[in-house]
Amino acid sequence: MKPTVWHHLRLCPHGHPDETLDDAAIAVDETGTIVWLGAFSALPHGYAHWQREDLHGAWVTPGLVDCHTHLVYGGTRADEFAQRLAGVSYEEIARQGGGIVSTVRATRAADETTLFVQAAARLQPLLAEGVSAIEIKSGYGLDLASERKMLRVARQLGERFPVSVYTTFLGAHALPPEYAGRADEYIDEVCERMLPTLADEGLVDAVDVFCERIGFSLAQTERVFEAATRRGLPVKLHAEQLSNAGGTALAARYRALSADHLEFLDEAGIEAMKAAGTVAVLLPGAYYFIRETQLPPIELLRKHGVPIALATDHNPGTSPLESLLLTLNMGCTLFRMTVPEVLQGVTRHAAAALGRADRHGALEIGRQADFAVWSVGSLAELAYWIGRPLCEQVVRGGATVFRRMNG
């Protein structure tokens, strides 16, 4: 790759629209590393003969980060969507053997190639919106072989597409049918066999649990957290989505990277998150899709200064969403978040929710040049437009990996 100066751009280096620089430039060396950024008029003479790319006044932000997805799975749950429209609740569907378990059956039946092809089709719309880092959870296998299959596919996506993929083992997502009535025994399997094996195979970056009355108890969640901690793995938690089960306080005790959903989070849980440095990941796509009415406590999160991230929560049952930009709009319209909050929610704070704030979410000297180029007049348009293609170009490590074709 030739050293390149990207110039005549409007720079938003940290994802905050109040911290910008007009007519800026970014110098990227042959390794894809940012070696200088600032006002184009102040470009040092040493870069005068580098290759130039004129962005004609376009906005540049850090590559976006989708910090909570379930992108790898088999089948769809369109039939359950119809059930919910007829008045059947998400919890009722789950108790009838639908919900997560129906996707488990489809995922177990699919081979790696099928799962890869299906997941790749879901990933590509996100890449075309400037996503350069993404978390992908397991949790639709619920046995060792199937969880391994999911995590292997996630790793393959990161190898074959220009995106950093971070894997999360979510073996404690639901109780598999063969363990009906034996939840503690299943947690034994998760902690003593599945997690150690998959971690030893290098397939796990973090560990998550679905802590809820239709998921796993606080005691069971803590067992998984203990097992993860013994392996030196960070933890995350699906928490307080359907009720206040106290999961967030537990997550904070283990200094979780994030607690996610949080519609029923209380102030005590928020205070614990703040003290632990745990990021609040809000998922408006799921809130919208299952027609929830309990809003997450945005004002209390603001009051206590808890960093807020946003993510698609792409999954087949409650958020079949393939647009992080639409997620921004939902964060504003449904949760009344501000434009600066949602933009930081998919850059700096989303990177922190993955424990990767040193690698993603900001443009700084010494970092890899991962950025998105936007054809908008103001950054507010990223959250304003619905369905309009706004990303003109995506750069990874200084190389253009996506360019929108006009006409």
From Swiss-Prot:
Q: Which residues does the record give as 4-imidazolone-5-propanoate binding sites?
A: R77, Y140, H173, Q241, T318
Which of UniProt's keywords are assigned here?
Cytoplasm, Histidine metabolism, Hydrolase, Iron, Metal-binding, Zinc
Any Pfam family the entry gives: Amidohydro_1
Q: Could you say which residues bind N-formimidoyl-L-glutamate here?
A: Y140, N315, G317
A GO MF term: zinc ion binding
Q: In which pathway does it act?
A: Amino-acid degradation; L-histidine degradation into L-glutamate; N-formimidoyl-L-glutamate from L-histidine: step 3/3
Described purpose of this protein according to its UniProt entry: Catalyzes the hydrolytic cleavage of the carbon-nitrogen bond in imidazolone-5-propanoate to yield N-formimidoyl-L-glutamate. It is the third step in the universal histidine degradation pathway.
Give the record's family classification.
Belongs to the metallo-dependent hydrolases superfamily. HutI family.
**Can you say what this protein is called?**
Imidazolonepropionase
